[in-house]
């Protein structure tokens, strides 16, 4: 009997320890928010409006299709004054509900490419053709931390 009481007491102590650590985890001064992807774009001289025409048509169609599918929460386009020739002049910003919204992104992207461009091959060609009017400097994916 004494042995079973010791086991019960040990089990209770372990449960209490885990309860305390989960309570501590709930005390973060923030909660996880949306996931944000920011693409940095530099348009080539004289091609800002050419690129923005594509953004206002095809890119917007892609984002609206992703919103309709429930993958994208919102999106926006920001313009910025570049400091150097290698700085972006446009940021394309896409907001996702969470990291899980990015699961299966290749298949989702292919489906949207087929719907907006006719085929993945046509979308790839169009992507390459836009190199004559802009440079993609990179992108970052980050998560919003909502302060409590």
Regions found by a protein language model. Give the residues of each.
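Bacterial N-terminal signal peptides that target proteins for export
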Residues: 1-11
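Short hydrophobic/aromatic beta-strand micro-patches
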Residues: 42, 93-95
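Sec/Tat signal peptide C-region and signal peptidase I cleavage site
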Residues: 19-25
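Short beta-strand/turn micro-motifs at beta-sheet edges
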Residues: 25-29, 78-81
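Immediate post-signal-peptide N-terminus of mature secreted/exported proteins
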Residues: 26-50
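An amphipathic, aromatic/His-enriched active-site/gating alpha helix that lines ligand/cofactor pockets
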Residues: 27-30, 61, 65-73, 95-143
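N-terminal, post-signal-peptide region of Sec/Tat-exported proteins
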Residues: 44-88
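Bacterial N-terminal signal peptides
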Residues: 10-19
């Amino acid at each position: 009997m004494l042995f079973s009481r010791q086991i019960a007491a040990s089990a209770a102590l372990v449960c209490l320890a885990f309860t305390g650590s989960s309570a501590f985890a709930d005390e973060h001064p923030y909660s996880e928010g949306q996931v944000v992807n920011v693409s940095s774009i530099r348009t080539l001289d004289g091609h800002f409006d050419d690129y923005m025409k594509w953004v206002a048509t095809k890119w917007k169609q892609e984002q609206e299709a992703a919103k309709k599918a429930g993958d994208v929460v919102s999106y926006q386009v920001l313009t910025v004054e570049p400091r150097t020739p290698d700085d972006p002049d446009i940021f394309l910003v896409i907001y996702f509900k969470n990291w899980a919204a990015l699961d299966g992104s290749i298949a989702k992207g292919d489906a949207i490419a087929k719907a907006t461009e006719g085929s993945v091959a046509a979308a790839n060609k169009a992507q390459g053709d836009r190199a004559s009017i802009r440079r993609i400097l990179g992108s970052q994916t980050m998560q919003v931390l909502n302060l409590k």
